[in-house]
Amino acid sequence: MHLVPDGFRFPVGNILSLWNSWYFGDRVSGISPLRQLGGSDVVRRDKTNLCRARRVFDEIEDIAIQDGLLRAGERMRSVGIRRSNEIAKVAYTKLYRRLYDIDENEDIARYRIGEITYNAIYDKISRQNR
């Protein structure tokens, strides 16, 4: 069984645009949820992006669980697209504030966090964990 069509390239983009593909896939394009992909499902040069995306999305889901945005035993993939997107925005904003040391009372809109790629967030997480 192929999780992605031949010639598939792992997407590079911002977190919120990739969110639904990560958890729900794209049936029209024949792409399974990206979270299900393994190293053998992507070309060599995309393996790094797959690993980086996994780390970032796991971090966001962990925040959602810790903050009670997901109920006990609930996983992001089981809540449906609409609720998943709402949870993602809240949890990602919290992660962004933590990584960039932004006060909770400061207006986050000026930071244009929706434009930040998962690679940039991964780099920030990695530097913080050193």
Question: Which residues does each predicted region cover?
Answer:
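Charged, low-complexity regulatory segments of eukaryotic nuclear chromatin/transcription proteins
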Residues: E59, I63-R130
